[in-house]
Amino acid sequence: MKKEQAEILGFVPQKEIVYNKLLPYADQLDRESNDILAQIKGNLGRAVQLRELWPGVLFWTRKLSTYLRLYGRKFSKEDHVLFIKLLYELVTIPKLEISMMQSFARLLVNLLKKKELLSRDDLELPWRPLYDLYESILYSKTEHLGLNWFPNSVENVLKTLVKSCRVPESATQEMLDEWRPLLCPFDVTMQKAIGYFELFLPTIMPPEQHDKGFKLWFDEMMNLWVSVQNLPAWEGNLVNLFARLANDNIGYVNWDPYIPKIFTRILRSFNLPVGTSQMVVPRYLTNSYDIGHVVLWISSMLGGPQNQSQKQLNGLFSSIASFYHPSNNGRWLMKLMKLLQRLPASIVRRLHRERYKKPCWITPVPSTHKLTDQDVTDFVESMKQPVLMAMFSKTGSMDAAQALQNLALMRPELVIPPVLEKTYPAMETLTEPHQLTATLSCMIGMARSLLSGGRHYPEGPAHVLPLLMRALPGVDPNDFSKCMITFQFIATFTTLVPLVDCSSALHDKNDLTEMERELCSASAEFEDFVLQFMDRCFALIDSSTLEQTREETETEKMTHLESLVELGLSSTFSTILTQCSMEIFKVALEKVFNFATTNIFETRVAGRMVADMCRAASKCHPAESLRLFVPHCCNAITHLTANEDVSNEEELDKELLWNLQLLSEVTRVDGEKLLPYRTQLVQILQLTLRLRCKQGYSLACNLLHHVLRSTALIYPTDYCSVPGGFSRPLQEYLPIKDWGRPGDLWNLEIQWHVPSTEETAFVFYVLDLLLQPELQRLQRYAQGEQEMSRDDVLQSLCIVQHCLLGAGSMLPPLDGSTVTGLVPSMVNLEETKLYIGVDYDQSRENYREAVCKVMRQLLHYILEHSEDDTKSLFAIIKIISDLMHFKGSHKHEFDSRWKSFTLVKKSMENRLHGKKQHIRALLIDRVLLQHEMRKLLVEGCEYKTVHQDLLRDLLRLSTSTYSQVRSKAQNVLFTALGTYNFCCRDITPRVLEFLEPTRTDVTQQQFKGALYCLLGNHCGVCLANLHDWDCIAQTWPAIVRSGLSSAMSLEKPSIVRLFDDLADKVHRQYETIGIDFTVPENAVFLGRSITNSSQPTPHMGTPEDQELQQGLAVQQAKNREAEQKYEKLVKDLLECLDDRDLPWKFEHIAIGFLSLLLRDDYPLPAPAVFFFVQSLNHDALVVRKMAIAAVAGILKQLKRPRKKIPVNPCDISGVTEPEELEAGDRPGNDWLQYHSESLPNSQQDWDAFCFVEKTHWGYYSWPKKLMVYAPAAEQPKDLAPDTMSEREAIINDHFTDPTFINQLIKFLSLEDRKGKDKFNPRRFCLFKGLFRNYSDAFLPVLKPHMERLANDSHESTQRCVAEIIAGLIRGSKHWSFGKVEALWAFLIPLMRTALSNITVETYADWGTCVATACESRDPRKLHWLLEMLMECPLSGEGGSFVDACHLYVLQGGLAQQEWRVPELLHRLLSYLEPKLTQVYKNVRERIGSVLTYIFMIDVALPYTLPTKSPHIAEFTERILSQLKPLIEGDEEIQNHVVEENGVGEQDERTQAIKLLKTVLKWLMASAGRSFSTPVPQQLQLLPLLFKIAPVENDDSYDELKRDAKTCLSLMSQGLLYPEQIPMVLAVLHEIAGSSSWHARYSVLTYLQTMVFYNLFTILSSEQCVQGVRALVIRLLEDEQLEVREMAATTLSGFLQCNFLAMDSSMQTHFEALCKTRLPKKRKRDVGSVMDTIPSVDLVRRHAGVLGLSACILSSPYDVPTWMPQLLMDLSAHLNDTQPIEMTVKKTLSNFRRTHHDNWLEHKQQFTDDQLVVLTDLLVSPCYYA
């Protein structure tokens, strides 16, 4: 086969779509594909060489993607590589229009998709062009200013593209050099760098190249990940990178040292709730890991010699198992379910890759690390428990069903039996339908694994019959969801099983195994099953007839639910009959025939269901079925219509309708079998098509449609699970061997129905007989020669439409001359013709054209004479749509079938073995879909005059009087616009005519219709926004001008809404349109390689030289033209805006359009600049806002480039950089930091300094070339009025004009929305641009305003001056020293004034102002500002509030400077320390936040030297010495608040309490912000916090206690390094000996959270586990009851998450404690008091009982082997003294509550004696005893 094909093709295809070989016309496809490929290669290569990106290259790349959909990668490897290289060149053309770039990128992704087809040797692509493209779009410097408009989808397209590219082996090192310098953890660049590493770093390399691959970065990244504790945003990216690395290099990366840490972090990432009251750090929720990558990572680490990951995975699942129980719910549940669903799928994928996949160039997994059978078993065992619980989850059973499907593929014997155990009882129960739906949906997924049985699970198939029989009661008319899942269940199982009675084989054959004999005898029940199923269906139908389910008045259509049941019923019944043997089929046929013919059904609901069942029967075996049905129905109909009057009756007899309906459905069968009955059928059609009754003739039309369709279409006729059916005798073929057998793609033996000559003749005979006369009548009517009533017209149209639908596949498409002159192109833009199995007969009349002609005449006649006949218009619109697009199937039907095909495929596929092992019916369906796809592919159709006429008719209908007609016509129009090449250019001007203001004859309906035509629908073309200058230049000005049209009225809300939607859609969908269409030489060269390639030889060769010259000339002309069109569009819009009569709405729309036209590669024309600058002072706020944004963008366009030069950091610092990596504060980057003794205070210092503006340079490592700005002498001079361009002069004139500025400042200091306004970055950009481009030219005019504003303390004025100042400081980046000095001399006093007026409304704006001003600026440039801010944050002059605000502002500035101002941070800290004992809460909170930022730089990251900024350790020591009085004292710490004017120095203790309150604020603030947690320092404070924190959850506590509790909660959730755990445990042990029981109680709650959040890290050290265990057991014997109970709860939790095991030593310890003897109670006097202190013995005895109780409660959902004995032990204490009795009762009632659901299962674990005792215990004691 392959050889012959290679001979025809001339090459070996890379990978083609196999389904094409099964089409009935497969033998023609090789030649066809070669023709198309030669066409694509010739034209694409030619278009590239002629440099015609649009339409040439775009048109032919689209054809290439269509080719991929039709044939797969059916080209030689050489062509494949050429296509990829060419597209890569095209994608990376700089300045390429974004929509073209996306279209090329999507195709490129498709070509790169199957990695195994091209190895590294075949193809390497450079990574830098892609990186430049990605950077320019995702981190665009101009997008935020509105100079570039990118679509939302572009990010994902580019990411996918980057992931699919192969890069050379040297790339890893180059990438590290490029992005390492960005790794500054305090900066946003960190996120960017790690994001780039995740996307770009290559991980698929052969092992010998690993040294040039991941080994270069693995340790560095891994150490970074391990050392970060507080989940910054980029941690997730690292996880994604590691997951990809693990998956691509199984066995080559040693994960073992990291495994406990990895699993601890994964567990933390689920954010599960632990303990009682828990504070959640918000970033833990937003930055948590992506489950898909977590799953990939876990599944790649399993296996290997130790298989450590499996042990941890067991731990992970046992620790979270109870969260899967259906009674638990929360926002974490979705994540856990995703984990459950994806993990088995990922393991299956890995097994497939290791065991079944064809080897290719990608390195295989080394055999030492492949998953062994034991590994798989262990994995399945670990997942079984959670999956079985999740089956009944609140989120539905889908996730569990998918998990079970994959687990059953690997180990059916482990997972199927427990699910069956749940399924059988669920089928019996009537009260819990939810259980039935859940178990059935899980069984459906496991059906194939159950049936194929295999050596591990041979007893699987025996369950089929019992399951099927018991499922029958589920067909229940009263429970919809149960009914549907039952249908699905039955259909799934019967598709896989031939329903053949094989019991007779027991006597004939003696070579059967035991299992086969059992199946043979069971198969005798099949007949019974089929008949019972039918009875159930009949009952269902009887109860859903119209009379039963509707009131008289209600609708007669089927409801949505009924139509679903109908679908379920008919497809299930059809599946059953397909799989039946002939004997069973005959019985079933008899039964359904009797049911259908002895009753009369109404045709709407019940009738449809019965007819469907009959159709199913006749589809399976047409000959047998038609023999019964056709004569019966025909006789009945002939008999009932014998009377003349019948044809004129309005309401027909029910029996007649029912027989018609039945007949119309049973004829949907193999056309060949219909031919014997053709005379009868034609006779019936002639009788019934002219019935008066609408219901009657509609059914007759259906009959006509189905008869034609059955004979004219190509379709498969059998869907049986085994080719050839089951009719062979049992001696030679035993069907039970085929249970669950997949279809064999290579021997599918599809039986196709291809119309024979006889059938074709019959089709045309029917058309001549029935269609011809209708067309003639309609034509006479349209010419006014014959009267027809509306009903008659409608009836005729109905017949025409159904003839088209039936015979559409035989009628050749409309043809004619092409519409030319729409688009100039030097490349051939022809359409590709696909062969779809029909040879059109040119000798017969082409009815498509005839219908087309008559319909157009009729349409014009109706629109002229009776436009209100909307029903006929609807019919005509439908017919026009079918004339254009219908070749035998509809697009929407195809789409929904494709969807359902993928769903069924998913639910039944075998991902483990792969190789398309689907069931036969599914494969046949897929082949049919391939055929239909070929029929429906209409991309790139030529636009012919016929189409032009039809489109114009549709446009006329789209702008007609009635809204329903308009909307139906518009939908057809939009589909057509997307089908024909360039037809939009022809139609758009016609639509715009309706909007022309000069026309007075346009009605409102036409106006609205035209607007809707421009708007488009949500998925089609939007005419108002085609990405093309010609179209936009027409539509945008027309939309604006339509505001002057007489038909436009703003009183009509519908019209106003339309304009809003239009403007909104244009804004949403606009993408910057290209101006520069240059094609680079590399691409041209590749184009030549394509036209010169062979196999297949391109059908046209390389263009001649003169053509190439012409191409170059055309390209240059095109670029010029684009610029002219752009300028003209701007000019047109400005002209519209000049019109005084234009309503305000349209003015705003026009300005909106103008603002979309700003670009970064071509300056805005001067008149538009003038317009926007003037609009800054427009009356309308909306316009002012648009103008501010636009002017900021214009200033960016006018920005003059600055010269940069490379410098060598070592020359400046005088230090040579060390060989290995050293990050952080080191001698080599000391010169970047702020040193107050060497600041640039004079002109020469300023010029000598090397300023580095960006904060991240130099922290981690230096870039290869550090670029800094050249000295001032080499930079361009400041702008002088005589050297300005026109645009610059316009801005200059306005901003030096005092009246303009006056007005502007007035507007800018108005408030917009009270209390909602914030510092506005747009305005900041405006001022920054002004001062950057014109240096200090505008200061003189602005100064007086700024001084005035700064003195006014109103919110909006302060905000305005803050925006100006921020812009001014950032804009002064390149000013000369003199100007800068003068600037600060003016600004410093001004800011002092402003900051002294600070208020609660404005402090945030001032913070933003300073932060913005300091962002990306060298601190040595800003020393004036920083020193001013440092002066007086806590002077106390303005009261506590002003102090807090000053601190906030200062913090904004210093935080932006990160690690470069250690000196200032030290100064600030020494300044704050004495003031930490603040009284006011707001100041304390602010100080806490500032401290966080001061210590932020003190991080413990790998390769990082200790910082010069303040260290936490030293600070904590100083604090602790001041807190001594609190730590040493024993009395309770109260919140002392002393009056302000308290005399004298307060005592040490009060000072300490005030200090502590501030320290708590600092601890809380830093929990979510810093990178690493200072654990050793926190531990020193722990004892103090435990002392204060209250036990109950009560909000009435004072601030100090609440804060202490919060701090404990946050600390306990912290991630600990392994070496820190023993330190924490030591402190907890110490506190457990404290005298305060509150502290001892809190130790337990702290321990719960800490252990769970560091589970695997603690488990990896035996010593720590023992430490925790000892601590809990010690506190179980605490003298305080509350502490004992909490210890029991904690122990139970640890047992439940498998942190501690229930071993014999623990059990004996508790049993011993329980036996502690209690002292005898002495007889007392009645009046005396009991002793309140419990005796030591009682405590010990209680501890033992609590221990047992904890063990019992730790297994809430199952009964382990040790449980019964413990329950017996416990019951002995039921009558002990309190508190023991109470504990026992509580435990027993909890046990009863949690085990009640599955008590039947759990009962099995107990002996009879134990059950007797237990029943006594659990039944409430009798109250009358």
UniProtKB/Swiss-Prot annotation:
Specify whether Transcription is a keyword of the entry: no
Q: Which GO terms describe its cellular component?
A: cytosol; nuclear speck; nucleus; spermatoproteasome complex
- Placement of HEAT repeats on the sequence: 458-502, 981-1020, 1162-1200, 1336-1374, 1618-1656, 1662-1700
Compartments where found: Cytoplasm, Cytosol; Nucleus; Nucleus speckle
Tagged with keyword Metal-binding = no
Specify where the region named Bromodomain-like (BRDL) lies, as residue ranges.
Answer: 1632-1720
- Output one GO MF annotation: peptidase activator activity
Pfam families per UniProt: HEAT_PSME4, HEAT_PSME4_mid, PSME4_C
Q: What keywords appear on the UniProt entry?
A: Cytoplasm, DNA damage, DNA repair, Nucleus, Proteasome, Repeat
Cited InterPro entries: ARM-like (IPR011989), ARM-type_fold (IPR016024), Blm10_mid (IPR032430), HEAT_PSME4 (IPR055455), PSME4 (IPR035309), PSME4_C (IPR021843)
Its GO biological process annotations read:
DNA damage response; DNA repair; proteasomal ubiquitin-independent protein catabolic process; sperm DNA condensation
Organism's domain of life? Eukaryota
SUPFAM superfamilies attached to this UniProt entry: ARM repeat
Q: Which PANTHER family match?
A: PROTEASOME ACTIVATOR COMPLEX SUBUNIT 4
Q: Which family does it belong to?
A: Belongs to the BLM10 family.
* Free-text note on domains in this protein's UniProt record: The bromodomain-like (BRDL) region specifically recognizes and binds acetylated histones.
Assembly and interactions? Homodimer. Interacts with the 20S and 26S proteasomes.
- Its biological purpose: Associated component of the proteasome that specifically recognizes acetylated histones and promotes ATP- and ubiquitin-independent degradation of core histones during DNA damage response. Recognizes and binds acetylated histones via its bromodomain-like (BRDL) region and activates the proteasome by opening the gated channel for substrate entry. Binds to the core proteasome via its C-terminus, which occupies the same binding sites as the proteasomal ATPases, opening the closed structure of the proteasome via an active gating mechanism.
| Name of this chain's protein | Proteasome activator complex subunit 4B
Q: Which organism is it from?
A: Danio rerio (Zebrafish)
Q: Upper lineage ranks? A: Eukaryota, Metazoa, Chordata, Craniata, Vertebrata
